[in-house]
Amino acid sequence: MSADMAAQSESGEGGDDGRADGGLGDRLVYLAVLSRPRFWLYLAGPVVVGVAAAASALADLFGLEPVALFAYFLVPANVFLYGVNDVFDADVDEANPKKDDREARWRGDPVNTVVVAASGLLGVGLFAVAPRVAWPWLAAHFFLAVEYSAPPFRFKTTPLLDSVSNGLYVLPGVAAYAAVSGSNPPMLAVAGAWLWTMGMHTFSAIPDIEPDREAGIRTTATALGERRTYWYCAATWVLAAVAFAAVDLRLGALLAAYPVVVLGIVAAGVDVDRAYWWYPVINTVVGMLITLGALWRLVNG
C-alpha cells in the first residue's frame, strides 16, 4: 500500500471528480494511507512497553486486556485519530505538501466518514475489557484524540496546548500498564513520556509551519518559528530524559538520544522534511530496547 496509489485515486483516476471511489481495494488503500502506517506504533508501541513493564509473569503478556488494547491501538485507533484530524483539516491540507506523496487528503464521502466514526466507537469496547483503574487513562485518550482536532477546543490551533494535548499518544501505554498490573505506573514515568510526546509533536509540526501560517492556524511551531522550535523540542526531550532517569538511569540514557539527534540535525543543517521521517525508526528502536529490557527483567528476575 503506498501513498502514490492514494494520490492516484485523489487525482481522479478512481472517478470523475477525483473523490469517487474506484472500488473496495481503492478504499482500503485510501484508509490505510489515511491511518499513517509509519506512525501506527506511536499508539500501539506504548501499549507493548506498558504491558512489558507491568507484567509479573509471561502469561500477563498475552491476556485478554493486552491483546485487545494492542489490536485496537495498532490500526482502528489510528484510523479514528487521523480521520478526525483530516476531517477538520481538509481546507488546510489543500496547501500541505506532506499530503502530496506520503499522506492522503480527506475524501468527504459518507462511507469513509462512517468508517472513521465506527473506529472510534470500537474503542468503547475497551472499557468492557479493561479494569476500572485503566478507564480514566482511556477516557483521557479519546477526549484528546477528538478535541485535538475538533471543536469546541481544537487544541491544535492554540500554541502550547497543541503540544501538551499530544500526551494522548502515551495514554494507551499507561492504560495498558494499569490494566495488567492493576495499579497506575510511576507518575514520573508518565510525566517523562508526556514530555517526550510534546517534543515529538512539535518537531513533526515544523514542516507544517508555512501551510499553517498561510491558513491562519497558530501552533507552538508557528509561534516559535523553525529555529526556536528545534530548541523547544530539545528542551522537552532533556526534561523527559531527566524524568525517566529518576525512575531508572538506563531509561534516562535511552531518552537522551532524542535531544542529541535534534541538536545534530540543527548542527548538520539536515532538511526537516527529511529528518521528519527518521523519527518513526528512532522511536521503534528506543521502544524496542525498553521493551526488551523489561522482558529481560521478567525472565531473569
Swiss-Prot record:
Give a GO biological-process term: carotenoid biosynthetic process
Please give one Pfam family short name: UbiA
Entry function: Involved in the biosynthesis of the acyclic C50 carotenoid bacterioruberin (BR). The enzyme acts at both ends of the substrate, and catalyzes the conversion of lycopene to the C(45) intermediate dihydroisopentenyldehydrorhodopin (DH-IDR) and the conversion of isopentenyldehydrorhodopin (IDR) to the C(50) carotenoid dihydrobisanhydrobacterioruberin (DH-BABR).
Membrane-traversing stretches: 39-59, 61-81, 110-130, 133-153, 160-180, 186-206, 229-249, 252-272, 276-296
Catalytic reaction(s) noted = all-trans-lycopene + dimethylallyl diphosphate + H2O = dihydroisopentenyldehydrorhodopin + diphosphate; isopentenyldehydrorhodopin + dimethylallyl diphosphate + H2O = dihydrobisanhydrobacterioruberin + diphosphate
* Organism expressing this protein natively: Haloferax volcanii (strain ATCC 29605 / DSM 3757 / JCM 8879 / NBRC 14742 / NCIMB 2012 / VKM B-1768 / DS2)
Q: In which pathway does it act?
A: Carotenoid biosynthesis
Gene Ontology molecular functions: transferase activity, transferring alkyl or aryl (other than methyl) groups
Q: Which NCBIfam families match?
A: PRK12875.1
Region ranges (Disordered): 1-20
Q: Which InterPro entries match?
A: Prenyltransferase_related, UbiA_prenyltransferase, UbiA_sf
Put simply, this protein is called Lycopene elongase/hydratase
* Domain of life, source organism: Archaea
Q: What is its EC number?
A: 2.5.1.150
Additional notes on this entry: H.volcanii does not produce any known rhodopsins and unlike in H.salinarum, Lye is not regulated by bacterioopsin.
Compartment(s) where it occurs, according to its Swiss-Prot or TrEMBL record = Cell membrane
CDD domains to which the protein is assigned, alphabetical: PT_UbiA_4
